[in-house]
Amino acid sequence: MLSFILPLLLLASPVIGQNTSTCPTLPSAITYASNAKLPDPFLPLASPRLTTKSQWPCRKEEIRQLLQRYTYGQMPPKPSSLTASLSGTSLTITAKEAGKTMSFTVTLKLPTSATAPYPAIIAYGAASLPIPSTVATITYQNFEMAADNGRGKGKFYDLYGANHNAGGMITAAWGVDRIIDALELTPAAKIDPKRVGVTGCSRNGKGATIAGAFVDRIALALPQEGGQAAAGCWRIADEIQKNGTKVETAHQIVNGDTWFSTDFSKYVDAVPTLPWDNHMMHALYADPPRGLLIIENTAIDYLGPTSNYHCATAGRMAHEALGVKHYFGFSQNSHSDHCGFPKAQQPELTAFIERFLLGKDTNTDVWKTDGKFVIDEKRWVDWSVPALS
């Protein structure tokens, strides 16, 4: 049921990177008691539960470190040298590090009815949802970064070496970060780097979610039908599979795909031992506050509709604690065309684009599903939303 409940607040301020240099790093060995429920995003590994909003940046950094260590591999910082050149609609980005050089090119499609500098959406591969004529499209061939047909192949590894532990998902997020670097360096591209979104569908829906979680300069993420590692949680997917419905699980996803670090395979048969789940990736959008609209499909069991709903609901609890619940939307609609876009989901897509990219005073308190599954949040969440001062 579509709900527009909370009072409308002002638009997000421009994203400003947070200084996490004084935050503790992860210990070399982590002891975490097996937990079948979703871990508490407000409970750091070695500290009491959060009581203030000012404590969140270090917990956020800890979650990012956990995701990189256990699942995605390390995302390097900006390379020591980065340049950009614009030729027509092609923006070429060249990165140099430790004597190695790599270049990749994205394609710009500028708005037909707007004033520069324009907001833009980075589309993994190609956009599979409608982008309005007032917003630019940046087409990003993310699979150039990391090939699907062999680990350690692709432009990212040309720069950082074939043995780098990053999987394909985090290499693509690194590329998104570099695209924004290039936009900042290239005013002639006519793109406003402070109003950039990201989208993708299916495996690229996972990628878009991960990019927004790791790149604070992304103003809006629009992941579409990404299933687990985008909307859904590994713990819930395992239970769905155990109950007889075929769904994408952690155990399955590491077989043949190079999207994740090789370290993830150590944990896929013991998911309750992970000190995180994907609801905590959603929480990374909460501060600095950025838009996240998860677009999902209840007609495809493999996407794990129940997991997607429960996981996202748990993730939104972090937004609620930080006072930005309406920045995170969820829309789940039944249709048979994977990566198609039903008209029923257009109102929420329009609302999120208007608010986070076009600067309009639009209500984005959207949380809806046409799923008939039982909604029992206590089955997965044994913690509450803290009152953070």
Spans of model-derived segments:
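Fungal secretory targeting signals
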Residues: 1-18
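Flexible loop/turn segments at secondary-structure boundaries
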Residues: 129, 145-147, 205-208, 228-233, ...
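Mobile cap/lid helix-loop segments that gate and shape the active-site cleft of serine hydrolases
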Residues: 220-281, 304-312, 318-324
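Cap/lid segment of the alpha/beta-hydrolase catalytic domain
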Residues: 123-187, 227-237
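Primarily recognizes the serine-hydrolase "nucleophile elbow" in alpha/beta-hydrolase
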Residues: 179-244, 269-271
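Structural recognition of the beta-strand scaffold that forms the well-ordered cores
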Residues: 120-123, 136-141, 197-199, 219-224, ...
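Extended catalytic-interface subdomain
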Residues: 178, 199-201, 223, 261-298, ...
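Alpha/beta-hydrolase-fold serine-hydrolase catalytic core, especially in secreted/extracellular enzymes
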Residues: 18-105, 111-116, 280, 288-290, ...
